[in-house]
Amino acid sequence: MALQERRAAVTSSDILSAHAISSPALAAAAINFAASFHRDARTCCSAHERSQLQKVYRDKILANDKFTANIAAAFLSVLGPNAGRNDAGAERERWGDFDRLAQRGKNMRDRESQHLQHQSGIIAAWGPRCFEYYGWHVLPLPLLRQVHDLAVLIPSWDDAVELLNSRMLLRHELRVLHGNNKALRIGEHSAASKVQDSRSPVERTDIVAALDWARANATSAAARQAVKEAAQGMNGTPINTFGLKRDCYGMVVPSVGPYDPDGDDDNDEDVVDVSPRPAKHIKLSAAEPLRLMFPGSLSHVQACQRHDTDGEKASTAPIRSNKLSQSKQPELDTAAESLRTRHIHNERINEPLDEVSDCSLSLQTIAVGGGSAQEETPDQDVEHAHPEVEITSAISSELRKVDERTDGIRIGRVIMRRSHCMVREQDNQTNEEGTGEVQSQRDRRARDLGKDMETDMDIDSQLEEMLDIHALEAQRNHEEMSDGEDVVAGVAGPGTPTHRAAEEGGCREKEAENAKTDEEQVQDKAALDQAGNTNTNREVENAAPKAHSQEGALRASRTGTIVERTVELHSTHSIHQRASVNTTAPTVARSSDSDDSDSLHSPTALQNLQAYIDTRTHQLTQVLSQLNSTPDVRHHAQLQLDWLSPQRWASVYVEPEHHMGATSSASSDSADIWCLDWDTFHQYADSNHVFRRPVVIKQKFQDSGMYEVDRYVDMLWQRFPEQHIEVQNSITGTSRLMSMAEYCSTALTVTEAGTSLSDNTTSVSNAVNLRCLARADEPLLTRLERFQLLSTLASRVAGTIGRTEHSPPSNLESLLGFDALSFADAFSSSHANLFGGSWVRCLDGLKIYAIAADLDAEDWRRFADEGYKWSPRGKGRLIALEEDDVLFIPPGLRAIHASFTPEPCLMEGGMLWDECAIPEILDELLWIARHQAGTVQPLEFQLSSLIDALEQWLNENNHINQSSPSHTAAEERQTLKASIQSLRDCLSGRSAAFPS
């Protein structure tokens, strides 16, 4: 009887009326239809009732086939792929009609149809409430498809949520218990994640891992039971021990945060320690160094706190506001004024480097806690600092939030060590230089650097001390706050226990907090009293070692994460500040020794980027040295080691130095790489300068930051769902064809997980033969007339080639623009540009180019014999590219190069010729035609028409050097014609050996 009522209700409803309805109305109707099925399916008590319910909904879908092909596709798995297929007669025909309708819906490739299919399928299985609660309706299509596949395999929400919980707890355990910094805690989202809803703790990796498990174990009762047990805790410990709980739909979430409406928890032991989420990648653009280096500094946090408190003061009452008396209001006003002053100071920090190079950015003038004990008179008792403690507590909370948002800090420790070494080396060289002014400048820089770092550490140490005093709830009378200069209550130099503990980081933070006793808190208070009653900076310096000797190490380990980050940030800034000072200092004679040159100059932006990559490449070389499963794998791994180990970073000539750092080469001629901004490159190009070295161009793009690897992979699937893609394996060096569906699924998993040298990563290491699909803005150098020669000739011969069946690398027009998509630890093998010069722009991620340019005849003979297996034998030089960097390999520069990928990277580039280097281009093409047998037939096929067009172009007096004297121009023209004829003869002879 109940089933008949449901049948009548569904039949009489107008959810999917056959009348014309708009697309949004159709989507809403489809969602309601799926929700209705979920509700009715839950009331079925037997298989027979469910079978009858399936027929009811099948008939309803068939009655509105004009509008419901998408719904049929979504319900194909929900109603069961084999449901009723064994029936005879009319029922069998009805199921056949339903299958055909569903297939028609599956063939719809537009985004709207596919979103509708997957959303309806998920809601029909799990219901609409959890789907809307977690905001899954805004998931990108590839991830939504994977959630739908999971719902098909695990149709019960109770089972599905346990499976997702078990996957989330695995990564949470890796981070909290095993210290894996790449793993995300539950509730954290990576920068590249598309699951950003505040109530959804799942990441793409959780969904993919759950889907992989379901495909293998969905029918195993024992496996499901094991999953339920794993979802109850970590290593047998309940989840609430780690600051986790279950939300209203059974999902494991943090017990405090956006998942808790109250947002308040006084039990600090239940909350896991907070540290920065894993960064997608580091951006060290030289255009805005200070804005990058200071986002987590204390002044920035206080400025943020200023903005936050202004907006919330009227609506949110402080938790302990009843403890504040009216007499403390002046102190709060003073604290607010101090925060406002530091907000202005922070805005100056965010100015361009050249505008603030002469400004003092020392953090010694920052008042801790909005003007608390640091601004009191010597006779004032610090235990009455309640209002300021309230502010410092908020600042401490804000520090943790900013730590989670700040991603570009991983290289600070390396740069800090380099900066100390540079200062010491500079001091040791002062006697040889004999310049008093240089000596005084270096002394000031060293003194400022030490004070700034020491001040930063003491500021954070005092924050913790004041919080401890607040815990003691001390009550004493206040005196008027001093209007004098801020005093910092301790200096912890590089040799003190505080600094050594800060170097070790925050790994002992939890243990130190548990070990903190009331007696130690009293000692902290005494140390702060001693520092707070100090009148002069000299007394501060004398008191600091004594105050910090007993408690410094413990305090620094407790606040290690905050102190280390602040020191790293300010140390990095100090390096940039010294680079600015060097531009006005007297010129120092450069030594021919590269090591001495490095000690005399501040690191360039490229060298800072290289410092970050050093650790990554070292780890890669260690892994490669252990790969010896087969001879091919061992040989290919050795080839990568020949390029990477030992690391030989290119010497860089930088111009202009004041903008991008300092040159690391003795001269422009001896440099391996040039690094220029666009204006400087443009000046060289306008003067018809022939570039003899690769050039890294720093240029600003309007579309900067608009390209991401995962979005590009999604675009590939949308455009070419039924095609195959050629990919190269970085372990074996071999290439194979993969279906686009398999490639995109694996690539998205790799992008989210951040894995390297795993089976998944190596299988999709390099996507080759990609034409220009990103359509990013090209660098401005391609707009210069002298670099448009190849595109001009290609346009002249367009339509005369007569073939289209070539692979993309052999297609002339495809060489004018191409994309390169690589994943972690991808290696491209050794190769030379087929058509001369090239440019590549890094759209997303990081890339290392290894270039061997200064080669002799023996090296080129080996390359002709070995091809992509050629080893540089120590002649390769490395250069790192970050987002928006452009690498220009000049036409006519004969060089062999390979590329490595530290993290997923998307690049776009193209080939070009230079009108100022036509003789060199012809020589390069002649060498390739003689030695590259694998490209002879397609090379001859394309160059035969291209050379004719070039000769005609030269006869029209289009050569850029036509202003030369007549006799010189005639000689150049005859030389070019002779080279063209030699190339034509070579191609004709080899074409006879390789007939079509």
From Swiss-Prot:
Residues 307-333, 425-449, 489-556, 571-602 are annotated as: Disordered. Residues 440-449, 500-527 have a biased composition (Basic and acidic residues). The keyword Disulfide bond does not apply. Induction: Expression is positively regulated by the KK-1 cluster-specific transcription factor kk1F. It comes from the Eukaryota. Keywords: Antibiotic biosynthesis. GO terms for biological process: antibiotic biosynthetic process. The keyword Membrane does not apply. Residues 318-329, 428-439, 572-590 have a biased composition (Polar residues). Pathway: Secondary metabolite biosynthesis. Disruption phenotype: Abolishes completely the production of KK-1. Part of the gene cluster that mediates the biosynthesis of KK-1, a novel cyclic depsipeptide with 10 residues which is a promising active compound with high activity against many plant pathogens, especially Botrytis cinerea. The role of kk1D in KK-1 biosynthesis has still to be determined. This is KK-1 biosynthesis cluster protein D. The gene is kk1D.
